[in-house]
Swiss-Prot record:
Gene Ontology MF: a single term: RNA binding
Protein's UniProt name: Endoribonuclease VapD
Taxonomic source organism: Haemophilus influenzae (strain ATCC 51907 / DSM 11121 / KW20 / Rd)
Family as reported in the entry's similarity comment: Belongs to the VapD ribonuclease family.
Origin: domain of life: Bacteria
Length: 91
């Protein structure tokens, strides 16, 4: 399982033609094409173990004309285990 996490800077409104919120939406749409699902905030996970898929997703993000000036930090990492404690905390 792989994850991608990123931070979009406030100045994105100067680079993206439709502003910060649309930038997040566009990033999510690109990642969804490669099977990534938003879990919280700017964290997207993918159950696919194929690193080539991860690279293809990153290359697709890189094609967005505004992204290099809008993302302060973007990281990809492998998740060994994923435990969802939401139900445990709520009950």
């Amino acid at each position: 399982m792989y994850a991608i996490a990123f931070l979009v800077v406030k100045d994105t409104q100067d680079y993206h033609p439709k502003g910060v919120q649309q930038a997040y939406t566009d990033i999510g749409a690109v990642l969804a094409k490669f099977g990534f699902v938003r879990t919280q905030g700017s964290l997207y996970i993918n159950m696919n173990e194929d690193m080539a898929n991860l690279f293809q997703a990153m290359n697709a993000l890189k094609q967005l004309a505004w992204i290099s000036q809008s993302v302060r930090d973007i990281r990809a990492f492998r998740i060994e285990q994923w435990s969802d404690f939401t139900d445990f905390i709520r009950n």
